[in-house]
Amino acid sequence: MNILSMLSNDSAVQLQLQLQLQLQLQLNLQSAPSKASPPTLLPKQTTATTTNATGNTKTVARYSAGDINILNDENSHGVDESIDEPVTNGQATNKESVKQEPTQPTNNTETEKKPLTLSIQNGADKKSLPPQSQPPRINPLVADVTLSTSKFKNVLAHIQHDQLEIDLDYKFKFESNVSLIDQLDKNQRLSQDLRILKFDEVKSNNYLISTHQFTTNYIDRVVAEDISSRNNKISDTNKNKEIIHIDHSKPLHHNSTRGKEYKWGSTREIHKVESKPKRKRNTENSETNNSRSTVSSKASTPSKSLAFGSTHHVPIRPKGSKGTNLSSSSGPITDITNDSNNVRRSSRPKSKRKAYEDGEGEDNGNNIDSNSTDNNNRNKTQEGGRGPKRIRIKLKVKPEGENEGEEKDEGKGKGRGKGKGKGKGKGKEKDGDKEEEDENNANGENGKSKGSVSSSTTTTTTAAAAAAGGGGSTGSALGTTTSNSSTSKEQKAFMRQYDNTYVAIWKDMSRKDGPKVSRLMQQSTQAKLINLKKTCILAAREAKRWQVKNTKNQKDLSTKARRAMREMFNFWKRNERIERELKKKHEKELVEKAKREEEERESKRQSRKLNFLITQTELYSHFIGKKIKTDEIEGTDADPRIKAQEKAHLDKYAGVDAANNDILAIDFDNDDEDALHRAAAQNAQNALANAQNQAKQFDDTEPFKNPDTNGEEMNFQNPTLLGDLSIEQPKMLKCTLKEYQIKGLNWLANLYEQGINGILADEMGLGKTVQSISVLSYLAETHNIWGPFLVVTPASTLHNWQQEISKFVPNFKVLPYWGHAKDRKVLRKFWDRKSLRYDKDAPFHVLVTSYQLIVSDIAYFQKMKWQYMILDEAQAIKSSQSSRWKSLLSLSCRNRLLLTGTPIQNSMQELWALLHFIMPTLFDSHDEFSDWFSKDIESHAQSNTGLDEQQLRRLHMILKPFMLRRIKKNVQSELGDKVEIDLFCDLTNRQKKYYQSLRSQISIMDLIDATTTNSSSNNSSLDDSSTTSLVNLVMQFRKVCNHPDLFERADVRSPMALVKFAETGSFLREGNDLDVSYASENLINYNLPRLIYDDLISANENKNDFGSVYAKFSVYDPENLRDLGWISSAGTSPNEIQQLGKMNVLERAIKLQRYTTGSPLDRINYLYEGDYSSPNSKLLINPQNQHMISQQQIENSSVLLDLCNISQKVYEEMYLNTQDPAFTPLASAPPITIVCSSNNFQNKLQNELFNPTIRSALAPMSLNKELEFMNNNTPLELYPPSNMLPSSLSKVNDYSNIRMPSMDRFITESGKLAKLDELLVKLKQEDHRVLIYFQMTKMMDLMEEYLTFKQHKYIRLDGSSKLDDRRDLVHDWQTKPEIFVFLLSTRAGGLGINLTAADTVVFYDSDWNPTIDSQAMDRAHRLGQTRQVTVYRLLTRNTIEERMRDRAKQKEQVQQVVMEGKATTIMSKKEDAASKKKDVAFLLLGGSGDGDGDGTGVNSGVDTSNDVSKSTTPKPEVGKKKNNGNKKNVFGNGKKRVREEDGEEEDALNSKRLQELYHEGEGEFSGTVTPAPGV
C-alpha cells in the first residue's frame, strides 16, 4: 500500500508536527539542566500572501523556532519575496508574494534583539537590494508548501527556546521533502483519476532523480518497503546482477529499490553495497571536507552579535544527508541555490587546511573567506542571469562563561554534523561506526580549539548555496559557537537514541494511522469522482442547452457580419473603381480631344496638300489634253458647258511663274488657295517640259542623225516639231481602219509627239492590236523610224501577233523571240551587232516575245534602246511588287504603250500600277492615290454608299490624257449584242452528301484566326500559307459543284475470274488471223482414265445388252410408263416421251422452237396488259394501200414484218435489249474441263460442241436460205429453228460479266453536266458552235469522255498545249465548221485569240476575277462577229458559286464607276473584303451552302421558278419574283414543265422522266459518300 496516496495536506502537516513535538520532549528530558532557566522562546510568525494564477489569495504561515527571526534589514523597509511556481504543461509562471511581518521581541532584556536580515546578492555587487528588486529563485517544488498557522502556533507555544533549537538547514530540507512527497502524491492521484497530469508526475520524478532525494527521509523508505516486500529477499548471487539494471527514471518503482539495504533507526539514505577500499576513500574525502568547513565556520568576521539564551544548541539534522556541502563564506551572507545543475566547482586547486591558533584565526579566516568569495562569484547560477542568493541570519550567543560545557557539546555536535554532511552514507557495518567516531573526535577537537575565538559576541555566517546536481544537492551549513563540554561518545549515544526514537514513532504511525487514513482517502476520492462525474454531466447538459439556443443566433450573426463586411468591401471597391474609371475617362477625353484637334489640323493640312497634288495632276493632264485632244477622240457625251467652265478655270494658270514650287517648302497651313494653285501649275508645266526634254534627248542620241544640217529643223524623226496632227491611214497598212480606229491612231501619234506614255483601254474586240500596229507603220512611213519596236504579249498570242504584223504590214521584219535557250541565243545575234542602223533594210524591225522570256533574259534586253514598247494584256503587270513589273520598267524606251481591255480587274491599286508604269514621276505614291480615290470608290461598290461626283470628275480628268477607252456599243453599230444568261442547277444526292461532309469539317474559329492572326503578323510566308489553305478549301467546294467524280471515279466491276489462259508460242508464227477461241480454262480439271472410258463407257454403248440395261433403268421407257396412262390424254404418246428422254436440253429447245407472228413486245403486252394488238397497228404503210400487199405476205416474211413494224423494232432495240442486268455474280469461271487421252472421247467431245444442228439453231438464218423460203412461200411456222441465242445482253455486255460505269449515271450525278447535256442537244439542233470554258483541267478530261459518248466533235486547248498546237487549234476552229465544241481553260484560252466562229459561250465554272471571264467571252464577241453572242453561265444554287458571283458583280461595279463614270446602285451584303483572305472567308461563311434549296443562302431571293435568268447588264435580282403561270422550256423540246413555287417534292418528281428517277439516287449506293482523302 502506498502511504503517499493516503496523505493530504492537513494529514501531512499533523504528522510532521506530532513528530517534532515528541522529538523535542524527549530531547529536553535527556539534556543537562542549565544554571539559569532561560526564558521561553515563542515561535515567531511569518505570514505570506500567496497569489495563484487564478487570482485567489490565501494566507499561509512559516515559523521560526527559538529566537531565529527573519526581519527587515536596517536599511530596508521589508523584503517581498516572489516565489516562482513550476511551469507545467505550458502554463504561465505563478508567483507568490511573501511579505514577512516583524516578530515580537522576547523576554530577554540583557541582550538586544535584532532581526535577521534577508539580503540578495546580484552578481559581484554585495549590497542589499531594495524591496522592488528581483527576489531570489527557490526550489519550484517547495513553492506550494503551506502550513496551517493555527495548528503550528498551538504546538510550538509549549516549547522553551532554551531547551530546543531546530537547525534551519534541517528544517528547510524537511519541509522540502514533505512538499515533494505531497506534490508527487497529488500528481499520482490526478493522473490516476483524470489521466491528464502525467507530465507533472514525470517532472517531479525527474527532479527527484536528479537531486537524489527520494530516500532522504523515512517516509520514502516506508513507501519503498510497502511497494514490494520481496525486494529485500533477493539472493546474494543475483544481487549484483540486478543492481546493474536499476531504472532510475521511476524513483518509487520497485526496480529502483531492488538490491538496496535499508538501515532502520538512522537518518542515512539508501545506499549500495560498496567494497572496503572504496568506503575508505570516501571516508578520507569526507574528513578533509569536514576540516575545511570547520575552519571556514570559525573564521567568520565579527559583526553585530545576537545574545543567545543558552549555549546548549542541539542541531537537528539527518545523519549523512546526501548532497549537503559546507562551504566557507567571506561574510555573514549565505548562498542558497535551488538549481543543482548550475553549480560549478572552482577549478583552482585548494590547499589542505591546517589547524591554527587563536591569533591566526581571523587572518586565515579572512583569507579563506576572500578565496571562497572569489569561488562563489565564479559559481554564479546562469538561470535567468541572476546571481547567487544569500540569506543573512543573526544568532544570539550567550556569554562565554555561562555555558562552556554546552559549547563543547555544541562543538561536538557541529563537528559531527559536518562529518555527517560530508559523508555519503557508508552503511551499517561496524567499521563505518568506528570511522564516524574518529571523525567526530577530530571535529570536536577542532571545534574546541576554535571555540575561544568565537567566545565573544560574534556573528557567524552560514553559506547555504542550494544547487541541485548529479552528485547531490548542496545544503546549507549553520556555523554556531558551542562549548566542548560533551564528548564524542555521548554525542554518538545521543544520536543513536534519537534515531531509534524517530523510527519507533514512524512505525507506530504507519501501523495504526496508515490504514485508517488510506480508507478515508479512498472514500473521499470515490466521492469526489462521483460528484465530479455528475457535475460534468450537468455541465455538459447545460452547455448543450445553451449551445442549442445560441448556435443559430451565432450563425446568423456571423453570416450577417460577413455579409455586411463583404457588402461594405464591395461598396468601397466599386466606389474606388468608379472613381478611377471616371478619372481615366476624363483623362482619356482630354487626350482624345487634343488628339482630335491635332488630327483635324493635320487633316486640313493633308487635305490642302492632297488638293494641291490633285490640282497639279489636273493641270498636267489639262496641258497634255489640249495637245492630244482625248475628249474629241473618245467621243464622250458630257455637257460641253461644264467642260468649257473647267477649261476656263484651268487655262488661267497657263504660263504662270510661281516663286516657290517645291512641295517640301510649301506651307500648307498659311498659304492661300491661289498661291497653291499657281505652285501646282508651275510644277505641272515643269513636269511636261521634263517629259518633252527626255524624248528630245532620246532622239538626239540616235546614231543616224544628219550631221550636215540642223537636227531640229531637218530631222523628221523628231515628231515634237510637228505640233497637232490629223493623220490619215498609213499606206503600207494592208487593211482598212474604221473611223474610231483612225481616231485612236491620231491619239497614239500625239502621245508619241509629246513624249507621253499612254494606255489604250478599248473594250475587247475593238481592234487594239490593229491600232498599235498602225502607229508603228505611221512612224516608219511618215518619220522613217523603223525601230526597234518591242512587243510583249502572253504566250498564247505570240503567233497571233506575228501573223497579224506580217499580214497587215508586210514591210516589217518580225523577229519571233521564243523557243529554247539555244534558239534564243541565235536570235540575239540580230541586235548584238555594233553600229546597227534601224532603217528599212535592218535585220528586224519588230521583236515579239512573251512576259516570261523577257524576265529571264532581261539583261540582254536592257542593252538595247527601244523606240517603242507595246505591252499587250497589260493587266499582267498589275502588281507593282512583281519582278515582271520592275524588269519592264527598267528597260530604256522612248515611249510605252499599254494595251488592256480591263485596266481595273479587282481594285484601284491595279490602275495605279499601270499609271505608275507610264508616268513614274507623277504617280509616285500609291498611298496618296489610295487616299484620293480608291477607298471611296471601292467602299461605294461594296456597301452602296454615296459617291462624290466632283471627286469622280476629277479622277476622270486625271485619267483622260493617259488612257483612251471606247466601248462597243458606242463605236461599232454593226457588232451584234451580247446576251448573258445564268443557268441555275441543283445538287444531286451524291453532291449534297459530299457538300455536307466538307461543310461539317469547317470551323468558324479557324477561319477567323486565319483571316486575322496572320494578317497582323509581319511574316509573309505564314500569310501566304493561310491564304493558300483557304483557297484550297474553296476549291474543294467548287469541285463538288462541278462533278463528284472529281473526288473518286466509279470503278469498273467484274466477278472474280477463276481461270487460266493457255500458253502459246511466239505470235510471229501465227498467221494474220489469230484464233483465240477456247483460250481460257478452268482451274479445276477432271481427269478421266482412258481405260475406264474405252472399256466401260464407250464399249458398253456398242454392246447389244446396253440398250436393254438402259431401257430397264430409264424412266422414259414405255414399259415404265404404263402406270402413267393419262399421258395419252395430253396428246403425247409413250414413244415420243422416250425420244425426248434420249435428247439433251438444246435438242429439246430446238425441236420446240417455232416462228410466230408475235414479237417480244407483243409477248410483254400480252403478259402485263392482257391486250394483244395485231401487227397491222404498227405498220408504217398507209392503211389506204393495205390492199396492195396481203397480210399473209407480211406474216410469212420476217424481214417484211420488221419493216412494217420499225417503231416497235426500234423500241425493242433501245429499251428491251439494253437494260442492265439485275445481278452480277461474285465469281465466274469456264466449265470444268474433262481431260482424257482416249481418241473416242475427243471425237465425241468435238461432235457435241460442234453439232451442226445446234449451231444452225443458235445462229441467225442466212439471207440466202431465208430468200429461198420466201420464194417457196413457206409458212413462217415451218421455218427451221434459228437465231435462238438471246440478244439483249449481247448488245450491252457482249456475253461478258464486266460492268463498265454507266454514262447515263455519269451524266445524271452532276447537276451541271445534266443541264449542259440538255443545252448541247438544243444548241446542236439550232446549228450553234460552242466555246466551253473550264477552271479545272481534270473536269475537261471528264467532259471529253462525255463528248465522246455523245459523239460530239470537239477540240481542246489548255495550259499544257504547245505554242504551235495552239496556232493550229485556233486555225482549225476558224476553218472547220463541223467542229461543234471547243474546250478551253479560262486562263490559257481567254487572252488574245480570235474565235469569232463561235456564237455561244458556256462557262462551266466561273473565275475569281470577272474580267478574266469578260476577256474569255470577248474571244467570240469581237470584230468579225456577225451573229449575236449568247453567254451561258452554269451556277449551282445555294452554294459557294452564287456567293462568288455576287463578289464578281461588286468588282464589275468598280470598273463601271471608274471607266464609264456610272455610279449605279447595286445590292449586296456589307462585307469587308479588303484582302483576298477575307474574300475567301466571306465565300465560306456567306450562307448555308447545304444545297437543300431552302433559300437560306446569300442569294435566297433569286428566282427559283426559273432555271434561266437573262440580262444584258449583270444585275442581281432583288426579292422573289412570283410566277404563277408556266414557263416554256428554253431547250425547245416542245413540252412544258410546270414548277410550283413551294418546291414540293411531288411536283418535282412528276416533272421527271423514269430514267432520271432511276439514276438520281444511284450515288447513294456507290459506297463513296465522302471525298477521298488528299484530293
UniProtKB/Swiss-Prot annotation:
Q: Where is the composition biased (Basic and acidic residues)?
A: 239-250, 258-276
Q: Which Gene3D superfamilies does the record match to this protein?
A: P-loop containing nucleotide triphosphate hydrolases, Tandem AAA-ATPase domain
Q: Where is this region: Disordered?
A: 33-57, 71-116, 239-490, 690-718, 1488-1549
What does the subunit section of this Swiss-Prot or TrEMBL entry state?
Component of the INO80 chromatin-remodeling complex.
Domain note: The DBINO region is involved in binding to DNA.
Concerning its family, UniProt says: Belongs to the SNF2/RAD54 helicase family.
What Enzyme Commission number(s) apply to this enzyme? Answer: 3.6.4.-
The record lists the organism as: Lodderomyces elongisporus (strain ATCC 11503 / CBS 2605 / JCM 1781 / NBRC 1676 / NRRL YB-4239) (Yeast)
- InterPro entries xrefs: DBINO, DEXQc_INO80, Helicase_ATP-bd, Helicase_C-like, INO80/SWR1_helicase, P-loop_NTPase, SNF2-like_sf, SNF2/RAD54-like_C
- Note one Pfam family from the annotation: SNF2-rel_dom
Q: Which GO terms describe its biological process?
A: CENP-A containing chromatin assembly; DNA repair; positive regulation of transcription by RNA polymerase II; regulation of TOR signaling; subtelomeric heterochromatin formation; telomere maintenance via recombination; transcription by RNA polymerase II
Low complexity bias: start-end ranges: 42-57, 100-109, 285-297, 364-379, 441-467, 475-488
Q: Which transformation does this protein catalyse, written as a reaction?
A: ATP + H2O = ADP + phosphate + H(+)
Look up the domain of life of the source.
Eukaryota
Q: What is this protein called?
A: Chromatin-remodeling ATPase INO80
Q: Where in the cell is it found?
A: Nucleus
Basic residues bias (residue ranges):
387-396, 414-425
